[in-house]
Amino acid sequence: MTKPVWIRHASQLATLAGGSSSPVVGAKMNELSIIEDGSIWLEDGVIQRVGTDEDLALHYRDRTHEAQIIDASGKLVTPGLIDPHTHLVHAGSRQNEFNMRLNGATYMEIMNNGGGIHSTTAATRAATHEELFAQSKQRLDQFLLHGVTTVEAKSGYGLTLEDELKQLEVAKQLNEAHPIDIVSTFMGAHAVPREYKENPDAFVDMVIEEMIPEVARRKLAVFNDVFCERGVFTPEQSRRILEAGVRHGLLPKIHADEIEPYEGAELAASVGAVSADHLLRASDKGIEQMAEAGVIAVLLPGTAFFLMAESANGRKMIDRGVAVAISTDCNPGSSPTVSLPLIMNLGCLKMGMTPAEVLTAATINAAHAIRCAHEVGSLEVGKKADVTIFDVPDFMTLQYRYGINHVNTVIKNGTIVVAEGRLA
């Protein structure tokens, strides 16, 4: 039987309490519900008690000898970080495109000439299930070392029914085998494959009539995503795909307004999407409609940074009442990173967000963006015992001392999975 874990004397225990019922918006994104000299008791995989060290020492005075005690003196304790937008399961690498972009090629130029998503699609189609599992597990291990305990994972590098199912089956197997929880998204509409270049509507029909029903039948995904962008899928095609997903029980998400304004934010609001992601070029009208419809903005500053583009205006979105989450967009072409803490720092430096806001965006709002805020995203009694401990005294220092992995300890479902910065 696993011993209880008792975290004691945290310099700051950032609980993020109070935001489980609905996404956190506006000024409340700066409210972290911090407990100084904080303490938390984890048992049977869930959080049993949260408070000051004095409170827990009194409450558990007869059980102290039972617990594995972690001294968090001088450290920041937060909920396990949550990454709500990744392309985790893929094969291959695209470092050659990095040099092409440095020499002036754009993302869409590379893609339209057979690179980009098409390059990764070819590698992923060629990879076996076992090869995809092994490569993706390595990424998950790195996520864990950077404090992440839950990730969303998209398909979208298969673009055939067989290969999309292969990606989703790998994600399912990883979810069962790895400490990190994985929430899967079907994204067969990530790109129009080259074999359908002359007839993209036929591919859209296949996504709607063949892929979505089979993914839903096998219960391999929670969400259905589409890349709504000029040269990829039009707003009309995107609407058809998202509405088809809803008919089969898949919740809508959308890659929106990344390269240019394309009414993606407006479409997200219209179809009641759980989130709209990227939004670098979202219109003011679209932002307002997202706020009214309760669509979460999942912002990906690492992608803009890596593509040398202007970031999404996170400050404007928060000030206009949009709930903002933040993510790595881990993928081989435009954001090959697993460091969510670094992405949080970019949220401050490139999107005008405060250190408190980016922590909210990487925990409770990220949980809402993948519909699991009832289980994770805050340190509250009854939630999963997912905790990250950083070697910094407070949440401000976490963003101030950038480019360093400050993760000391990660606890998943009450089990220590990272200790002293290494996999346990």
Swiss-Prot record:
Enzyme type, top EC level: hydrolase
Binding site for Zn(2+): H85, H87, H255, D329
UniProt catalytic activity: 4-imidazolone-5-propanoate + H2O = N-formimidoyl-L-glutamate
Cofactor(s) needed: Zn(2+); Fe(3+)
Gene Ontology BP term (one): L-histidine catabolic process to glutamate and formate
Documented EC number(s): 3.5.2.7
Metabolic or biological pathway, per its Swiss-Prot or TrEMBL entry: Amino-acid degradation; L-histidine degradation into L-glutamate; N-formimidoyl-L-glutamate from L-histidine: step 3/3
Residues given in the record as Fe(3+) binding sites: H85, H87, H255, D329
Broad class of the protein's primary localization: cytoplasm
Stored NCBIfam families: hutI
Designated name of the protein: Imidazolonepropionase
Organism the protein comes from: Brevibacillus brevis (strain 47 / JCM 6285 / NBRC 100599)
